[in-house]
Amino acid sequence: MWFLILFLALFLGGIDAAPPVQSRIIGGFNCEKNSQPWHVAVYRFARYQCGGVLLDANWVLTAAHCYNDKYQVWLGKNNRFEDEPSAQHQLISKAIPHPGFNMSLLNKDHTPHPEDDYSNDLMLVRLKKPAEITDVVKPIDLPTEEPTVGSRCLASGWGSTTPTEEFEYSHDLQCVYLELLSNEVCAKAHTEKVTDTMLCAGEMDGGKDTCVGDSGGPLICDGVLQGITSWGPTPCALPNVPGIYTKLIEYRSWIKDVMANNP
């Protein structure tokens, strides 16, 4: 089962013992404090839902399948439960999913099918007021060049450090290094569609991965933001089954146009 599908089951159905969606970095480590100042925590009401990326003082990029009707975000967080004076809480004025993302895939009664296409899994979220850019809250640039297969990539997120569905969440922001693989590797590993607007990254030996709720968080390859977490298998971190990320170089023009046309 894809962790995106698990995301939907938890988000729509809920779990008594845990928030409906949580990040899960497998085989990672505590990120150095304030080393990921562009990483955003996206909440629905007071429940953590997804990751995101700060693109400028007004805009956050996340996954389209993280769409909800009651957003709030935290910027500059390291530990989700500690009072961190340098962190910033923000409300949202609008959310704009990519028009090519099939929102019907998010319906509660949707039955997953191998022909489902989760391309265009990205969404822009505008803050109600500009973020204050500081040492711990900083935007990151969009890519200007294609990523290179074999690159060393860094993914980050909050949550479980185990690959099962036990939801043992981490309080601290976790980081994990992954290898950028060819899309052919992911096409062989998954029965679902892997398209040219996706990136394939993981550890072929298993044990390192992103998973449920890391959706929308950054994939930074050789120091450049190249993707955001989209979908993958559960359990996470299986051998020979890398994860899928939205390929941002394919959407640079759309992102820039939306930001320019919604001042």
Swiss-Prot record:
Pfam families the record matches: Trypsin
Any one of the GO CC terms: secretory granule
Task: List GO molecular-function terms, semicolon-separated.
Answer: serine-type endopeptidase activity
Say which domain of life the source belongs to: Eukaryota
Residue positions assigned to the propeptide: 19-24
Q: Which cystines does this chain contain?
A: 31-175, 50-66, 153-221, 186-200, 211-236
The residues covered by the Peptidase S1 domain are 25-260
Record's keyword annotation contains Disulfide bond: yes
Gene3D superfamilies associated with the record? Trypsin-like serine proteases (2.40.10.10)
Protein name per the record: Renal glandular kallikrein
